[in-house]
Curated annotation (Swiss-Prot):
GO terms for molecular function: rRNA binding; structural constituent of ribosome; tRNA binding. Pfam families: Ribosomal_L5 (PF00281), Ribosomal_L5_C (PF00673). It comes from the Bacteria. GO terms for cellular component: ribonucleoprotein complex; ribosome. The lineage of its organism: Bacteria, Pseudomonadati, Bacteroidota, Bacteroidia, Bacteroidales. Signal peptide: none annotated. HAMAP family: Ribosomal_uL5_B. GO terms for biological process: translation. InterPro entries: Ribosomal_uL5, Ribosomal_uL5_bac-type, Ribosomal_uL5_C, Ribosomal_uL5_dom_sf, Ribosomal_uL5_N. Part of the 50S ribosomal subunit; part of the 5S rRNA/L5/L18/L25 subcomplex. Contacts the 5S rRNA and the P site tRNA. Forms a bridge to the 30S subunit in the 70S ribosome. Belongs to the universal ribosomal protein uL5 family. This is Large ribosomal subunit protein uL5.
Length: 185
């Protein structure tokens, strides 16, 4: 809990005032905040093997500290042998304390464990949100390399209240996300 308190405290004491000065906000309510982090795993191979979903739920629950839910297909697709409401993925939405804990773990522990890591791309969605793709779940310390059966990737989406990509980039940069082509001021 001390990490969570420190990250929230850091936002209130250092990050928010820095963003207010940088973008010349007239009100503190205009300062962008991190609303939620959504972690998603698309598991197309779950159509053939149902146990993959259970394994993925357990792994994502261990990584995030919050129960993961299976996502289901919305329609039939015969070419993929897919039926409506079949589980084809796993997701978790993190808010408040767990969100800050996961962000801390991602920045300080998981990302540095990626092989040949040179930083993450700084491409946003046009509305201040950022999605990061990770190829292997083994970068997280909660995953035991010996016990995994299949290496699975995941998408991590950072949803912010920032209206523009520039403001979203500044917020996530202040939180410590290591962007590749970071602009030095």
């Amino acid at each position: 809990m001390s990490n969570t308190a420190s990250l929230k405290k850091e936002y209130a004491e250092r990050i928010a005032p820095a963003l207010k000065n940088q973008f010349q906000y007239s009100s503190t309510m205009q300062i962008p905040v991190l609303k939620k982090i959504v972690i998603n795993q698309g598991l197309g191979m779950a159509v053939a093997d149902k146990k993959i979903i259970e394994v993925a739920i357990n792994e994502l629950t261990a990584i995030t500290g919050q129960k993961a839910v299976a996502t289901v297909s919305r329609k039939d697709i015969a070419n993929f042998k897919l039926r409506k409401k079949m589980p084809i993925g796993v997701m978790v939405t993190l808010r408040r304390e767990r969100m800050y804990e996961f962000l801390e773990k991602l920045v300080r522990v998981a990302l540095p464990r990626i092989r040949d890591f040179k930083g993450i791309e700084s491409k946003f969605d046009g509305r201040g949100n950022y999605t990061l793709g990770i190829q292997e779940q083994i970068i997280f310390p909660e995953i035991n390399i010996d016990s995994i059966t299949k290496i699975l990737g995941m998408n991590i989406t950072f949803v912010t209240s920032a209206p523009t990509d520039e403001e979203g980039y500044a917020l996530l940069k202040e939180f410590g996300l290591p962007f590749k082509n970071s602009k030095k001021d």
